[in-house]
């Protein structure tokens, strides 16, 4: 674990590792393995992958036992490894790094917590098993097709559950993938109005992209400031606060944020790009 974290999480108090960072580690450090991660998963798909012998990792909701600040909503996210299922009991067997091994989790409860993260899932498998994985994923094998399916599902869920902040957040996240930034910003507006969890921007950064690319710099700055109140060492929030400062004409403040993001995460490609961008002006 520490061998991996030294590369993708060099600061031990970093509260988040993105799933694409995990995927990059597999691709660059474990050449005998392949990985896939998709969004918009389902209970049936998880069962199919497990039945074929593939453990599946998902990102889902976790609640802390104690508060870290006044009026802490205790909501957080973490990765959960699924290693089996029991249709009779309607449960998955899960490996939970916070609680312990081989814990049952009901299908319904898992799906409710999984929705908050766009039902993302990841699997790692030997190269020779790629045809089987491709067959199981079927229409979701193509990342673009998968995102379109997730976008359609989020549209349906936000229409059927208009008070569900995660349905709107997922809609925005999938719109960002297709660079519909104005539409995504509107979806995130709805999610904000309904009230997303206090730590949401520790794990997901679609609102930053949506507000930046739709020209809503004041909203971008406000969100980045809020995210840093909750997670002061978030390199992603520092990066986007830096871009907000840049848009507002505060180049020195932008440079300081980009440098701090890089200091927190050495090699952070987006921070390196931002610093190079400022240097080229």
Residue ranges and their predicted role:
Residues 1-45, 51-52, 117-141, 174, ...:
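Cysteine-nucleophile protease catalytic domains, especially the papain-like/related folds used
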Residues 41-95:
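Active-site-adjacent substructure of cysteine-protease-like catalytic cores
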Residues 69, 73-74, 83-176, 183:
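Noncatalytic regulatory segments and standalone regulatory/sensor domains
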Residues 172-182, 189-243:
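Alpha-helical adaptor scaffolds
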Residues 177, 213, 247, 277-281:
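Register position in tetratricopeptide repeats
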Residues 255-281:
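Terminal, low-structured helical/coil segments at or just beyond the last alpha-helical repeat
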């Amino acid at each position: 674990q520490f061998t991996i974290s030294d590369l993708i999480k060099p600061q031990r108090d970093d509260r988040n590792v993105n799933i694409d960072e995990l995927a990059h580690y597999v691709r660059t450090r474990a050449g005998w393995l392949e990985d896939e991660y998709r969004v918009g998963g389902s209970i049936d798909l998880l069962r199919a992958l497990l039945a074929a012998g593939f453990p599946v990792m998902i990102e889902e909701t976790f609640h802390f036992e104690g508060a870290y600040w006044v009026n802490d909503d205790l909501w957080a996210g973490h990765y959960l490894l699924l290693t089996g299922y029991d249709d009779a009991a309607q449960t998955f067997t899960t490996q939970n790094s916070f609680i312990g091994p081989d814990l049952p989790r009901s299908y319904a409860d898992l799906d409710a917590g999984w929705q908050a993260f766009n039902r993302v899932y990841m699997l790692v498998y030997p190269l020779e098993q790629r045809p089987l994985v491709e067959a199981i994923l079927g229409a979701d094998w193509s990342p673009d097709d998968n995102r379109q399916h997730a976008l359609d599902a989020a549209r349906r869920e936000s229409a059927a559950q208009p008070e569900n902040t995660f349905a709107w957040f997922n809609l925005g996240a999938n719109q960002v993938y297709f660079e519909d930034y104005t539409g995504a910003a509107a979806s995130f507006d709805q999610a904000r109005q309904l009230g997303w969890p206090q730590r949401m921007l520790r794990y997901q950064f679609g609102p930053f992209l949506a507000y930046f690319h739709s020209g809503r710099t004041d909203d971008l700055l406000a969100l980045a400031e809020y995210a840093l109140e909750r997670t002061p060492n978030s390199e992603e929030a520092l990066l986007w606060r830096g871009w907000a400062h840049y848009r507002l004409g505060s180049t020195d403040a932008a440079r300081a944020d980009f440098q701090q993001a890089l200091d927190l995460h050495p090699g952070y490609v987006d921070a390196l790009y931002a610093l190079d961008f400022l240097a080229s002006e």
